[in-house]
Amino acid sequence: MLRKRFKRVMCITSVLMMVVGSLGGCGGQKETAGGTTAPVEEAAAEAVNFPLADNYKFSIMTRVASDSEQDFSKKALVQRMEEATNVTAEYKAIPEEQFDDKYKLSLSKSDMPDVVTKMYIKPYDILGYAKKGVFIPLEGYIETNMPNLKKVLDARPEVRASITAADGHIYTLPFVNEWSTNSKENINVIGAIPYINVTWLDQLGLSMPTTTDELKIVLEAFAKEIKVENGTVVPMSFRINQVNQDPGISLGAFGCGDNMDHYMVTNDKKVYYTLAQEDARKGLEWLHELYAEGLVDPEIFSQDGATYSAKVASGRVGLFYDWAIGLAGDYTDQYEALPPLAGPDGTINIPRQNYYSFDMGVTAVTSACEKPSVVCAYLDQYFEPSMSIQNCYGTYDDPNYTNVFTQEGDMLKWTEEGAADGKIRNDQNLYDCFAILSDYYGVYVDRMLDSDALRLEMVSTIYSPSITSDFNYPAAFMEQKDITRISEIETDLKKYAEQVKAEIVKDGITDDAWKTYLDKLDQMGIEELITLKQKGFDLFYELTNYENAGQGTTAAEK
């Protein structure tokens, strides 16, 4: 069955690929004076028809989890792709904890791999490798050799904009994993969700709190009335300034709230910094009030992830913040998501995180690659809808591993084991080149992964209606000089702002101290920082008509 799908995909690919020119000159770096390298000029792409008459091999470096299959040649997807294309992808799988160091080292050598994937790098590094002639431009190959990816980029202009450098070139291939075309409903529009112990609420005869004042009353009751056998009750816990465990979502009851990089956008498209806003101060002072009364865990400033997880899983925390309710372990059934709270003046707002349904810097083809057209055409097979799902999660009819899916006609259906166990998925998947759009569910695969579907329902029904901002800060691909300047300012400024954020929760802040803090932000360059971030937002908006990004056509309509 998979062979039939492969043949159908290959046939479509061959028909769509038009000859643009010869392959000559498409490999190798360009030497400049002094022995340095310069960007590789874009080469003409060449039509490719699979299966090739003669076998072609290319090398690809990737990362792998320590508990999953290390030998990618044993994976059914890799074997089936070779059979269908007559292209051998020679994977060099590097353990997760060593990958970042090893791929950087490999890209500094003359015998670098043809492809490096699962890098997850940002524009500054992408442009750095491009200027050295390590990464080659890919937009010509996308147009000629990658019809599946092109279809996705045409349907999602925000993804195309995010991978297009200021010089007009595309140097890396993304992955896309989308759960909704409504950006306010995607599962990553917010990060940490507050989960409250409803068993304790029922035990005390209390209703779900709807305001910040009511939450304080509930936390006081937890502290005074609840007894546990395995330690002391912790009414409220989180990890300040830590991804997906920070309480910034609850600060929206006082205005803008907070997110992990502290950039937000007003509905008239103005970028601002949350930790320089008066209403963010009010929210932090509310947390200080709770902290001063002993209602907030004193370890919020210092506990690591393992300590926090163990504490929540012990069942003695009344309210905790995390991406997933499952952090509560055996006590998960006792918790529910805390709905958006109204602040003292009635404000209800859920702040957006600047998370995206794609990653811009996943896969690059290097100047060592002798036949980029063949390699890009090969990688494009994984951007076909059904293949994308298998690349991301795993496959079916594999006699050597527990299967993630079965297949009925063109529909993939989750197995019980595949849906439940990430290791089973990692043994079969590649998780590098894929694009899963929200309209694929129910067409190419029977349903979402259960945990994603649960979070999507939670976000879309409980939190999305209270998201007041129409924009998050996008994945803007800015000029290298602007990226450099942002980094220069942001490194110290963000560290200082987050330090003061934690200090306010612990000790509160006076008007004079707040003014001193704002003056220090000015001295550190916050005005220039926001100007540069605004420039990036405006550029992205111009490229994508961002107001409608991701909400129009489907890939199938292109």
Describe each model-derived feature in a short phrase.
Residues M1-T13:
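Bacterial Sec-dependent N-terminal signal peptides
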Residues K4, K75-Y91, L105, P194, ...:
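Extracytoplasmic/periplasmic ligand-capture domains
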Residues R8-C11, C26-I217, D261-Y263, Y272-Y273, ...:
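Conserved N-terminal structural module of periplasmic/extracytoplasmic solute-binding proteins
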Residues G21-G25:
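C-terminal motif of bacterial Sec signal peptides marking the signal peptidase cleavage site
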Residues D111-P113, G231, R316-V317:
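Short, high-confidence coil segments that cap the C-terminus of an alpha-helix
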Residues L127-G128, N241-V265, H288-V443:
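Extracytoplasmic/periplasmic substrate-binding proteins
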Residues E139, H169-I170, P174-Q245, V265-K311, ...:
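Helix-loop-helix "hinge/cap" segment bordering the ligand-binding cleft or interdomain interface
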Residues P385-G508, Q551:
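Conserved small-residue motifs centered on glycine
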